[in-house]
Curated annotation (Swiss-Prot):
The gene is vma-3. This is V-type proton ATPase subunit c. It is found in: Vacuole membrane. The chain crosses the membrane at residues 9-31, 54-74, 92-113, 126-151. SUPFAM superfamilies: F1F0 ATP synthase subunit C. It is a multi-pass membrane protein. Belongs to the V-ATPase proteolipid subunit family. It comes from Neurospora crassa (strain ATCC 24698 / 74-OR23-1A / CBS 708.71 / DSM 1257 / FGSC 987). It holds the Pfam family ATP-synt_C. The record marks E138 as: Essential for proton translocation. Proton-conducting pore forming subunit of the V0 complex of vacuolar(H+)-ATPase (V-ATPase), a multisubunit enzyme composed of a peripheral complex (V1) that hydrolyzes ATP and a membrane integral complex (V0) that translocates protons. V-ATPase is responsible for acidifying and maintaining the pH of intracellular compartments. GO terms for molecular function: proton-transporting ATPase activity, rotational mechanism. The keyword Transmembrane applies. Gene3D superfamilies: lithium bound rotor ring of v- atpase (1.20.120.610).
Length: 161
């Protein structure tokens, strides 16, 4: 073990892996629950619109996939031998980037999905506007995924221990 590769270096990579999946799944579950409540309330009055308005729930679920992708990439690089502290910090940052972006995107999708679904039941022309706002909310999570993938690609460069 050297100063560049201490014994505790893989801990930071493992925390990045954990942060990626935990925070994105928190956002996805909040978005799913909040949108699902709106769909259930809307379905009482307009059951014909339930399938059409399931879009926010699907978009919230996609947020969890972003965290899964980054988590798998980080866990694939985790080793006990020859793991640099630099790699651990970069992978922690990658996990936090996708995780917190996914958490924010999930909150936005849940709030917009709930209000949009309820509004669509009263005024069907609101559907297109709801979809556009949901796309912008989903892109927030995608930004975190892109940053995490770029960071993780830098972490796996040759580091000598």
């Amino acid at each position: 073990m050297s100063d560049l590769c201490p014994v505790y270096a893989p801990f930071f990579g493992a925390m990045g892996c954990t942060a990626a999946i935990v925070f994105t799944c928190l956002g996805a579950s909040y978005g799913t629950a909040k949108s699902g409540v709106g769909i259930a309330a809307m379905g009482v009055l307009r059951p014909d619109l339930i399938v059409k308005n399931i879009v926010p729930v699907i978009m919230a679920g996609i947020i969890g996939i972003y965290g899964l992708v980054v988590s798998v990439l980080i866990s694939d690089a985790l080793t006990q031998d020859h793991y640099a502290l630099y790699t651990g910090f970069i992978q922690l940052g990658a996990g936090l980037a996708v995780g917190l972006a996914g958490l924010a995107a999930g909150f936005a999708i849940g709030i917009v999905g709930d209000a949009g679904v309820r509004g669509t039941a009263q005024q069907p022309r609101l559907f297109v506007g709801m979809i556009l706002i949901l796309i912008f909310a989903e892109v927030l999570g995608l930004y975190g995924l892109i940053v995490a993938l770029l960071m993780n690609s830098k972490a796996t460069l040759n580091t000598s221990c």
